[in-house]
């Protein structure tokens, strides 16, 4: 397990706002910091050499244990078509690729695939897969029940697909807020810390795949004929 520590230095003057309010404020800030740290580790973590989990966007060399960035498995355009056959075809290739593990053994992945994209790209994906129903409602859905999720740790222009149950994320125990009033005495401040143990790694290099996003909203140039 890896130890994850978060801390905050609070000026003692803030205690005038009340000790209960300060503790609640510090706890909220540090827990949010935890969430950001875990999100980074589970997506982009560089492994034990970096004292981090192995992220979903990484490959692990089975012989040396070296952790490297995943190479792109293809391109996704989410281009419009009369009946959505382009999107269905592109995502079919994703589902097909994830249906085989690193040892070449087939596995069931339907209803288990999650697509993670940066919030900037999420708007483009949503726009390309949203339709208006006969009742006037706007509905967004992806083929094969792929679940879209936003994450700031995924680079812009990339889409991360992973299979539920193929990534081992472990968090041990709870956390406890500790207060140290002597550490920063000269600065007239109090140090607050929380710590927790966590780790994560994919079961194999086919637990997740990375694709390039090339979503364009520029209409194709018209071809003039004489």
Locate predicted features.
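Extended oligomerization regions of viral-like shell subunits
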Residues: 55-185, 190, 196, 222-226
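Short glycine/proline-enriched loop/turn "hinge" motifs that connect secondary-structure elements
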Residues: 1-2, 184
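General N-terminal targeting signals
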Residues: 25-27, 32, 43, 47, ...
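Short helix/loop capping segments that flank catalytic or ligand/cofactor-binding pockets
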Residues: 17-19, 124-126, 171, 201-203
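Active-site loop/lid in soluble adenylation, ligation, and acyl-transfer enzymes
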Residues: 9, 13, 182-184, 197-199
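Alpha-helical scaffold segments that mediate packing/assembly in large oligomeric complexes
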Residues: 3-94, 219-225
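Intrinsically disordered or highly flexible coil/loop and linker segments, enriched in small
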Residues: 36-43, 47, 104-111, 201
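Structural signal for terminal/edge beta-strands and the immediately following C-terminal loop/tail
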Residues: 201, 206-226
